[in-house]
């Protein structure tokens, strides 16, 4: 599958990089996490150039990977890299804005198997700094969840922070800050039975499921999305 993408002048201007018909820029897809419930598959990632991340991507399939749709609008200058579904209906995707530095971490939440999503910021309006990226995300129930935020790129003296949510990701509060890396207690790795793997020969991301000691491929997504060629203004 090739995720459709057409570069616009607004994309180039907002990201602050140069692409023209004379010097086009290659555009790539990166997929970082995957999970599934029954025949419903989900993957997340971003669309980027060599220089900058352009958009987040959230893809879903309702037929075991045979066909795919984008199930959330792309978020400009952002990426998604965490994904969890607790049951067939309840799920979360975590990410952040990535330009010019990782900032404004957020969680997307759904209660209807990905048909609708709500975007909720992790940092409160009173947070003195907006920089940070989600390093870990886990929900132990439909209500209780946590994220670890790394704020080191923003120059924070105590860069690691634990935020918890008591209402399924609708709101978040700061619980701990530390100069040393923090980890969510009892949180497993991202779905150990599903993964995205780069196949260099095929230039594709493969969605794979663990079955015993083997990995079975269910879908392939092209890394290359074409060239960004923005004509000069007239």
Feature locations, PLM:
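Extracellular glycan-interacting surfaces
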Residues: 1-234
């Amino acid at each position: 599958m090739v995720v459709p993408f057409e570069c616009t002048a607004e994309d180039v201007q907002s990201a602050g990089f140069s692409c023209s018909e004379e010097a086009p820029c290659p555009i790539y897809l990166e997929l970082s996490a995957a999970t599934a419930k029954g025949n419903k598959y989900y993957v997340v990632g971003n669309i980027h150039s060599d220089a900058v991340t352009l958009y987040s991507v959230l893809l879903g399939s309702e037929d075991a990977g045979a066909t795919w749709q984008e199930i959330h609008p792309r978020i400009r200058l952002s990426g998604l890299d965490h994904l969890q579904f607790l049951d067939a209906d309840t799920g979360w995707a975590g990410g952040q804005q990535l330009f010019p530095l990782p900032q404004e971490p957020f969680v997307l939440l759904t209660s209807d198997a990905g048909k609708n999503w709500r975007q909720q910021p992790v940092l409160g309006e009173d947070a003195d700094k907006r920089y940070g990226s989600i390093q870990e995300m886990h929900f132990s129930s439909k209500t209780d969840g946590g994220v670890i935020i790394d704020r080191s790129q923003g120059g924070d003296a105590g860069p690691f922070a634990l935020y918890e949510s008591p209402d399924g990701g609708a709101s978040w509060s700061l619980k701990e800050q530390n100069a040393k890396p923090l980890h969510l207690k009892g949180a497993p790795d991202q779905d150990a039975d599903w993964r995205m793997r780069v196949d260099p020969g095929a230039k594709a991301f493969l969605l794979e499921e663990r079955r015993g000691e083997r990995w079975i491929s269910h879908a392939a997504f092209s890394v290359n999305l074409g060239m960004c060629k923005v004509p000069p203004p007239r």
